[in-house]
Amino acid sequence: MTTTIRRKFRVSRQMKASLWGSQKDPVHKRNYAPGQHGRAPVKKISDFYKQNAAQRAFRTYYVIGKKQFANVFSKAYRGKGNTNDNLISLLESRVSSVLYRSGMVPTIFAARQLISHKHVTVNGEIVNICSFTLKEGDVVQIRDRASNIPCVVAALNSNSESPHYLEVDREKRSVKLLVLPKFEDVPYPVVMEPNLVTEYFSSKM
């Protein structure tokens, strides 16, 4: 977990923006790239660099490995309709994403931990795979035994808002996926560029 957090902060500094909107992100104090050359003048950035940075931002944001993310994109590319929207729908319909987006946990890392420890159900059945994909109408719920976990209690008592494609019931600790979102529906705290992700992978297909 510590390694993951260090990596996420590194990506935030490369983007010069807090990827999750966290006030604890060191980018707020060191708004330059990491490493000994972080303060050096910025050279002209190539298209490939921008594309690679875009796909890395998405991978880091959703905590997905390279191979798994490539598989997600491949599925989005083969699907009907707009590839960018397909990609976002697949990423946002993961159980870890829905739980995080509901506001019932403070971070996507907390969501993943609850899921892996079998504290979460989907339609009443325990799910311990973070990449489990939900369908419209599916209900995710935090189990009773996790109701007193400090980060869950704090999140449930907060006034955080959830996007319109989710229906949250804080008393029942549940969230329902009403509709698969498109890119413009998702409240990213930083600029995310799925079009560059499409360009990145399209050149490899």
From Swiss-Prot:
GO BP annotations, alphabetical order: ribosomal small subunit biogenesis; translation
UniProt cross-references to PANTHER family, sorted A to Z: 30S 40S RIBOSOMAL PROTEIN, SMALL RIBOSOMAL SUBUNIT PROTEIN US4M
PROSITE patterns reported in the protein's UniProt record: S4
Organism: Neorickettsia sennetsu (strain ATCC VR-367 / Miyayama)
Keyword Ribosomal protein: yes
One family name in Pfam for this protein: S4
GO CC list: small ribosomal subunit
Keyword set includes Cell division: no
Similarity-based family: Belongs to the universal ribosomal protein uS4 family.
Signal peptide start and end residues: none
Record text on subunit structure and interactions: Part of the 30S ribosomal subunit. Contacts protein S5. The interaction surface between S4 and S5 is involved in control of translational fidelity.
Gene Ontology MF terms: rRNA binding; structural constituent of ribosome
Domain S4 RNA-binding stretches: 93-171
Protein name as annotated: Small ribosomal subunit protein uS4
InterPro entries membership: Ribosomal_uS4 (IPR022801), Ribosomal_uS4_bac-type (IPR005709), Ribosomal_uS4_N (IPR001912), S4_RNA-bd (IPR002942), S4_RNA-bd_sf (IPR036986)
Xref: NCBIfam families: PRK05327.1 (NF003717), rpsD_bact (TIGR01017)
TM region(s), chain numbering: none
Gene field: rpsD
Keyword terms: Ribonucleoprotein, Ribosomal protein, RNA-binding, rRNA-binding
UniProt function note: One of the primary rRNA binding proteins, it binds directly to 16S rRNA where it nucleates assembly of the body of the 30S subunit. With S5 and S12 plays an important role in translational accuracy.
